[in-house]
Amino acid sequence: MHLSQLLACALLLSLLSLRPSEAKPGAPPKVPRTPPGEEVAEPQAAGGGQKKGDKTPGGGGANLKDDRSRLLRDLRVDTKSRAAWTRLLHEHPNARKYKGGNKKGLSKGCFGLKLDRIGSMSGLGC
């Protein structure tokens, strides 16, 4: 009995030691990307100076607001893809309206009369 417990522990330890070595060749590390808006903003900032339309001598407040709005715009989920996924997952928003018209023909079937309150067939047969 003592020998079997020792073998079980050794087997468990050997399995645990193999598991981390198998996990190492996983996915490559992710490199942080810069959003497309920031790549465009950096060359403009390097150009120096203000835009021709800026009338304020500081001009920092408007620039900060633009940067914030650009970041928020980049963080938003693409609405077109979101709508496509919603359409795919939910058959049709008014599907109940269409299903109701099709069920009227079922009440004349061979399996009995439709029970309106429950929404199932009575099971009376032909």
From Swiss-Prot:
GO terms for CC? extracellular region
| InterPro entries, A to Z | C_natriurtcpep (IPR002406), Natr_peptide (IPR000663), Natr_peptide_CS (IPR030480)
Q: List all Pro residues biased stretches.
A: 26-35
Q: Which residues cross the membrane?
A: none
Keywords noted in UniProt? Cleavage on pair of basic residues, Disulfide bond, Hormone, Osteogenesis, Secreted, Signal, Vasoactive
Which region is the signal sequence? Answer: 1-23
Ranges of compositional bias, category Gly residues: 46-62
| Location in the cell | Secreted
As recorded, the propeptide runs across: 24-73
Q: Name one GO molecular function term.
A: hormone activity
Query: Any keyword DNA-binding?
Result: no
The SS bond pairs are C110-C126
Q: In terms of one coarse class, where is the protein primarily found?
A: secreted
Task: Specify where the region named Disordered lies, as residue ranges.
Answer: 20-71
Q: Which GO terms describe its biological process?
A: blood vessel diameter maintenance; cGMP biosynthetic process; growth plate cartilage chondrocyte differentiation; growth plate cartilage chondrocyte proliferation; ossification; receptor guanylyl cyclase signaling pathway
**Family per record:** Belongs to the natriuretic peptide family.
Task: State the protein's name.
Answer: C-type natriuretic peptide
Task: Please tell me the species this chain comes from.
Answer: Ovis aries
